[in-house]
A protein has these predicted regions:
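Bacterial N-terminal signal peptides that target proteins for export
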Residues: 2-12
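Hydrophobic helical h-region of N-terminal Sec-dependent signal peptides
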Residues: 12, 16-20
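C-terminal motif of bacterial Sec signal peptides marking the signal peptidase cleavage site
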Residues: 21-25
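Secreted glycan hydrolases and related glycan-binding modules that recognize and/or cleave
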Residues: 27-86, 92-115, 121, 125-487, ...
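Generic short beta-strand segments
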Residues: 157, 496-504, 543-546, 570-572, ...
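N-terminal helix-cap/turn-to-beta initiation motif at the start of protein domains
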Residues: 480-498, 534, 655-659
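Beta-sheet ligand-binding and adhesion/scaffold domains
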Residues: 483, 557-659
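N-terminal glycine/threonine-rich, aromatic-flanked beta-hairpin/loop signature
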Residues: 504-573
C-alpha cells in the first residue's frame, strides 16, 4: 500500500517547560486521538498528518517566560494502520511559513532558528499495525524580543519512497517571549490548596484573596476540577478527556491560567475517573508509562504546574480485566505516580483520597509513595467527618510525612453555607499545632459568597494574618464584576427578602385541608427593616417572616456575625397591660391539619448568612422546610400553631437584596 508522504506542514501545539510557558489552544474536546479529517489529502484512501499531543489546535500562541524552555509534543498519524514500519521525519520549515504568509496575507516572522530543536533528530516511527508514531519533543529555547510575536512552522516527511501529496497543509504556532513569571510565593509553612469545579466557576476568583500584611496570595495551589481518564473503545488505550468547560479553560490559558501563575499561584489539573474501566489503580506498567507521557504533554502544552489524581467513578473490572489493565490495587496506583514523577520532573503530583484502594501506597523501584507525591488530601469534609483524619497519614501511607497531608478538607460551597457550617477555629489550630502542611478547600462558589471573612478566620489561625478581597469577581467565561463588601453599617436599611421555598395547605372544595405542598419561591409580604441596636453592635429587625403584623410591631434582635445577619429564636414581646400575650420566635415546620408546629427544643439553633460579591445576603438555617416565626403564648403555653388563614409559610433559605 502507498502511504502519502504527507508533508502536512504544521506548527504543532507546543508545550511549556516547567512553569514557564504560556499557551492557549486545544481542540474542542481536547482528546488526543481526535482529528479533523476534513482538511486532509489522501493517497489511495490513506492519509497522514502532523498532530500535537493534548489536542492543541493550529495558530496557538505560546509564551516563553524568561529563560525557560517551551516544549511541544508532535506525532504523525495515518488514517489506517500501517502495513509496515513507516519512519517520519519532522523539521522546522521556514518555507512553509513564507507560503502561509503569502496565501493568507499575514506577515509572521520566524522565531530564531537557533533557538529551536527537535528531539531524536525529529524522527519517529509508526510501527506496522499501528496508526500513530511516537511523539517527538519540539524545544523552544528562550530568544527573540520580549513583547514581539513570532511564528514557527513544522513539516513532516515519510520514508520508503512513498508518494508525496502536492496539496500540503500547514500548522503554525505563534511564539511570544515574555518576562519571567514568579516562583511560588510562600506565606508560611502550610500550603493552601483549592479544588475549583470549573463547570460552573472561574479559577481567577482564587487569585483575588490576599494576605493583609504583604499582599501575597492566600491560595498557593488551584486545581482545575476536573479532566477525566478514559479508555478508547477502539484501541484500548487510556487517554485524557476534557469536557467543554475544561477545554474552554485550556484553550484560553493566557486568560485564565497565566494571571494566577503571574501572582505566584500554581495551577494544576485534576484527573478523575469517568465511569469506564480506566482508573489509576488498574493500569499495567506499560499503560502507566504511556499515560504519564500523555499527562506530561498536557503539563507542557498548557503550561500547567502539576496533576492531582482523584480515583472516583471508575468502573473497575477486577474479575476479568481487559488487555492493558490489571486488577485494582494500591500498588498499581503507586506505579502510576512513580511513572509520572519520572517524566514530570519537579511538577506537582497530588492525590485526593478518602477510602483505601483509591490511593497509592508502598514503594516502586525502591522509592516510597510518600517520597514521590507532593501532597495528599483526605476526601471527607466537615459534614461527613467533623473530626478530620488526624494521624491517617501514618496508618495508611508509606513514608508520608504530616507536611504532605491535609487531614481537614473544608468544603465551602452552598451545601455548607459557604464553609461556615461546622466551622470551629480549634480544628484549624490542631492542623497547625500538630505540624500538618496542607490545608485543602473544595468547591468555592465565588458568585454566591464573599470568602474573605471565612478565610480571615482560618488564616489568622494558620498564619497569624488576615485575608483581604480585591472586590473583583469573575464569571465562568471571564467577565469581571466589581463587588461590594458589607460592614456593620451597610446592613442597616430596607431589604427585600425572597425565600427559596414555601409551603401551603391544599384545601378541597368543601374547605377540608388535604395536604401541604410546595409553593416555590416567595417574597416576604413586607420588606424587612434593619436598624442599629442601642449598643451599636447588633440590630433591631422588623417585618421578618410570614407574620409581619406581629414582627412589625414586635421586632427581633439580631447579631452582626461573620459579616452578615445572625437570626435566632427569642422572646420578642413579654405580656404587659397593653398586650398580655407573649410572643416568641421559634423554628417550625409543617404538620397535619394546618399546623405549622413550633419546636422550642431547637431554640439553641440559629440562622446565619454570608454576603454575595454583589452585596446580596444569603441566610441559611435548618433546611428548606423550616422557618422561624412568632408564636403566641397565653398562660405560659403556645396558644395555637394552627393557621387556617395563612395561604403559605415562607421557608428557608433566603436571599436579601438592599432596596
Amino acid at each position: 500500500m502507498k502511504y502519502m508522504n504527507h508533508v502536512k506542514s504544521g506548527l504543532l501545539a507546543m508545550a511549556f517547560a516547567c512553569a514557564g510557558i504560556c499557551f492557549t489552544g486545544c481542540e474542542d474536546d481536547v482528546v488526543i486521538n481526535t482529528g479533523n479529517s476534513d482538511k486532509l489529502d489522501t493517497v489511495d484512501g490513506v492519509y497522514g498528518y502532523v498532530k500535537s499531543a493534548a489536542g492543541a489546535r493550529e495558530l496557538t500562541p505560546i509564551s516563553v517566560f524568561g529563560d525557560k524552555v517551551a516544549t511541544g509534543h508532535l506525532y504523525f498519524e495515518l488514517s489506517k494502520a500501517a502495513e509496515q514500519d513507516v519512519t517520519v521525519t519532522f523539521k522546522v520549515d521556514e518555507d512553509v511559513l513564507e507560503a502561509y504568509n503569502k496565501k493568507n496575507g499575514t506577515s509572521y516572522k520566524m522565531y530564531p532558528a537557533d533557538k529551536l530543536s527537535l528531539a531524536n533528530g525529529g524522527t519517529a516511527t509508526i510501527k506496522a499495525g499501528e496508526q500513530k508514531s511516537a511523539s517527538v519533543e519540539l524545544n523552544i529555547n528562550a530568544g527573540g524580543t520580549i513583547g514581539q510575536t513570532y511564528a514557527v512552522a513544522v513539516s513532516a516527511s515519510a520514508n520508503n519512497g512513498v508518494e508525496v501529496s502536492t496539496n500540503n497543509q500547514e500548522y503554525i504556532y505563534l511564539v511570544k517571549p515574555l518576562a519571567a513569571i514568579p516562583e511560588s510565593i510562600s506565606k508560611g509553612d502550610i500550603l493552601t490548596h483549592c479544588f475549583v469545579e470549573v463547570n460552573d466557576e472561574n479559577i481567577l476568583n482564587m487569585g483575588e484573596y490576599t494576605m493583609k500584611s504583604d499582599g501575597k496570595p492566600f491560595f498557593d495551589v488551584v486545581s482545575i476540577f476536573a479532566a477525566n481518564i478514559n479508555v478508547d473503545s477502539k484501541t484500548g488505550r487510556v487517554h485524557v478527556f476534557c469536557n467543554d468547560q475544561v477545554s474552554f479553560l485550556l484553550r484560553n490559558a493566557d486568560k485564565f491560567i497565566r494571571p494566577l501563575q503571574a501572582k505566584g499561584i500554581k495551577v494544576v489539573m485534576t484527573i478523575l475517573g469517568n465511569h469506564d474501566e480506566a482508573g489509576m489503580g488498574n493500569l499495567s506498567e506499560a499503560a502507566a508509562k504511556d499515560f504519564a507521557k500523555e499527562l506530561k504533554a498536557y503539563l507542557d502544552i498548557y503550561g500547567l504546574d502539576g496533576i492531582d489524581f482523584d480515583d472516583e467513578y471508575t468502573s473497575y473490572n477486577n474479575s476479568n480485566p481487559s488487555p492493558g489493565f490489571e486488577k485494582r490495587s494500591r500498588a498499581n496506583f503507586a506505579r502510576l505516580v512513580y511513572e509520572c514523577r519520572q517524566v514530570f520532573g519537579k511538577k506537582l503530583i497530588g492525590v485526593y483520597e478518602y477510602g483505601s484502594l483509591d490511593s497509592p501506597d508502598g514503594e516502586v523501584e525502591g522509592v516510597k509513595v510518600g517520597d514521590i507525591v507532593d501532597y495528599m488530601t483526605y476526601g471527607y469534609y466537615q459534614n461527613q467527618n467533623p473530626n478530620g483524619a488526624f494521624g491517617r497519614e501514618e496508618s495508611h501511607f508509606e513514608n508520608l510525612p504530616k507536611s504532605k497531608y491535609a487531614p481537614l478538607p473544608w468544603k465551602i460551597n452552598d451545601e455548607l453555607n459557604g464553609g461556615w457550617s461546622g466551622f470551629d477555629k480549634s480544628k484549624f489550630q490542631k492542623v497547625k499545632d500538630e505540624g500538618y502542611g496542607i490545608q485543602m478547600f473544595y468547591n468555592p462558589k465565588p458568585l454566591m459568597y464573599q470568602y474573605y471573612v471565612l478565610l480571615s478566620e482560618i488564616s489568622e489561625v494558620l498564619f497569624d494574618d488576615g485575608v483581604e478581597w480585591s472586590g473583583k469577581y469573575w464569571s465562568r467565561t471571564g467577565e469581571a464584576y466589581q463587588g461590594k463588601m458589607l460592614g456593620y453599617e451597610d446592613l442597616v436599611g430596607e431589604w427585600k427578602v425572597t425565600s427559596s421555598n414555601s409551603l401551603f395547605t391544599y384545601v378541597d372544595e368543601e374547605g377540608n385541608p388535604r395536604w401541604w405542598d410546595w409553593k416555590g419561591s416567595q417574597e416576604f409580604e413586607k420588606n424587612v427593616i434593619i436598624e442599629k441596636d442601642e449598643e451599636g453592635t447588633g440590630y433591631v429587625v422588623y417585618n421578618w417572616g410570614t407574620f409581619p403584623e406581629i414582627t412589625g410591631k414586635y421586632p427581633m434582635h439580631c447579631d452582626y456575625y461573620n459579616g452578615a445577619l445572625l437570626i435566632y429564636p427569642q422572646t420578642i414581646h413579654e405580656g404587659d397591660a397593653e398586650d398580655p400575650a407573649t410572643y416568641k420566635m421559634h423554628f417550625g415546620t409543617y404538620s397535619k391539619n394546618f399546623q405549622w408546629k413550633a419546636y422550642p427544643n431547637y431554640d439553641d439553633y440559629y440562622m446565619d448568612g454570608a454576603i454575595a460579591p454583589n452585596g446580596d445576603m444569603h441566610i441559611y438555617g435548618l433546611g428548606n422546610r423550616w422557618a422561624i416565626n412568632p408564636y403566641k403564648y397565653v398562660g405560659g403555653e403556645i396558644e395555637t400553631d394552627i393557621f387556617p388563614d395563612v395561604p403559605y409559610f415562607v421557608s428557608e433559605n433566603y436571599t436579601m437584596k438592599k432596596v
